[in-house]
């Protein structure tokens, strides 16, 4: 009996995740030098789409920034109780950084802009763009509380 109840609960959670994903769209994203405010890269591609690995060509001078500001603009047709992201940065398949971001409550049928600051590793720990380009994948896990809604991957190229 408990197994049936667990399966029913898992099914409801899966339906909730599918509903959130179906109603979620990443409208645009940009990366800025946090010190100057200058936009270094922007995209209108929906990089939250989990069906494929995305590609982003970013300028190599992004690696010289001490702090990067990331803005994402997204729309959700459904309520999200505790929207949050977990990001893992992989270099040739090995995790080199992890970040955690909490947005909180998302109103149904709303469009939101979310800004995060990301501090660079010390210069002595930075790899050159030639080593990183094409070898870095940023994996983003989208959650509502503890419910995993989607996972997307973006391969970075430093031009």
UniProtKB/Swiss-Prot annotation:
**Entry GO terms, CC:** cytoplasm
Instruction: Read off the SUPFAM superfamilies from this record.
Output: E set domains
Q: Which InterPro entries match?
A: Ig_E-set, PDED_dom, PDED_dom_sf, Rhodop-sen_GMP-Pdiesterase_dsu
Gene3D superfamilies attached to this UniProt entry? GMP phosphodiesterase, delta subunit
| One of the GO BP terms on file | sensory perception of light stimulus
Coiled-coil regions listed: none
Listed disulfide bonds for this chain? none
Q: Report the domain of life of the source organism.
A: Eukaryota
Q: Which PANTHER family match?
A: RETINAL ROD RHODOPSIN-SENSITIVE CGMP 3',5'-CYCLIC PHOSPHODIESTERASE DELTA-SUBUNIT (PTHR12976), RETINAL ROD RHODOPSIN-SENSITIVE CGMP 3',5'-CYCLIC PHOSPHODIESTERASE SUBUNIT DELTA (PTHR12976:SF0)
Q: What family, per the record?
A: Belongs to the PDE6D/unc-119 family.
Its protein name is: Phosphodiesterase delta-like protein
UniProt source species: Caenorhabditis elegans
């Amino acid at each position: 009996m408990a197994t049936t109840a667990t399966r029913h609960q898992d099914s409801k959670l899966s339906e909730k995740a599918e509903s959130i994903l179906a109603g979620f769209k990443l409208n645009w994203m940009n990366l800025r030098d946090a010190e100057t405010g200058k936009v270094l890269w922007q995209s209108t591609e929906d990089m939250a789409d989990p069906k494929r690995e995305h590609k982003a060509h970013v300028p190599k001078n992004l690696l010289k920034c001490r702090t990067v500001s990331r803005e994402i603009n997204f729309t959700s047709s459904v309520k999200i109780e505790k929207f949050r992201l977990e990001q893992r940065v992989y270099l040739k398949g090995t995790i080199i950084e992890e970040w955690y971001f909490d947005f909180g409550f998302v109103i149904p049928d709303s469009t939101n802009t979310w800004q995060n600051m990301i501090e660079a590793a010390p210069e002595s720990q930075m790899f050159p763009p030639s080593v990183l380009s094409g070898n870095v994948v940023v994996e983003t896990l989208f959650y509502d509380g503890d419910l995993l809604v989607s996972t997307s991957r973006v391969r970075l190229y430093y031009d």
